[in-house]
């Protein structure tokens, strides 16, 4: 039964491989080097601003302190349980 099912799959895969690459799609428009660099620079500046804003929000929030406290408390509880059981 396995051979019966795997042979058609093998035939389809071989046909796909032997068919070769598909027809070429339209060539993308050539961008000027300067406009491409300007777009890349603008993207980099935008990304930099967003990352700075994100890190500033994280620094100003109390999430890191709360997370650190939660981990400390949980670790302390685990240590206490291990001391009691051993």
Curated annotation (Swiss-Prot):
One of its GO terms (molecular function) is phospholipase inhibitor activity. It is found in: Secreted. Residues 1-26 form the signal peptide. The keyword Manganese does not apply. Belongs to the apolipoprotein C1 family. Apolipoprotein C-I is present in acidic (APOC1A) and basic (APOC1B) forms in P.paniscus, P.abelii and P.troglodytes and perhaps also in baboons and macaques. The two genes for ApoC-I arose through a duplication process that occurred after the divergence of New World monkeys from the human lineage. In human, the acidic form has become a pseudogene sometime between the divergence of bonobos and chimpanzees from the human lineage and the appearance of the Denisovans. Pseudogenization resulted when the codon for the penultimate amino acid in the signal sequence was changed to a stop codon. PANTHER family: APOLIPOPROTEIN C-I (PTHR16565:SF2). This is Apolipoprotein C-I. It comes from Ateles geoffroyi. The gene is APOC1.
């Amino acid at each position: 039964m396995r051979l019966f099912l795997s042979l058609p799959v093998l035939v389809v895969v071989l046909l796909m491989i032997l068919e070769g690459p598909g027809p070429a799609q339209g060539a993308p428009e050539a961008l000027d080097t300067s406009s491409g660099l300007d777009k890349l620079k603008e993207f980099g500046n935008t990304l930099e601003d967003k990352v700075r804003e994100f890190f500033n929000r994280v620094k100003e929030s109390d999430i890191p302190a709360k997370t650190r406290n939660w981990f400390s408390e949980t670790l302390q509880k685990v240590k206490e349980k291990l001391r009691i059981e051993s």
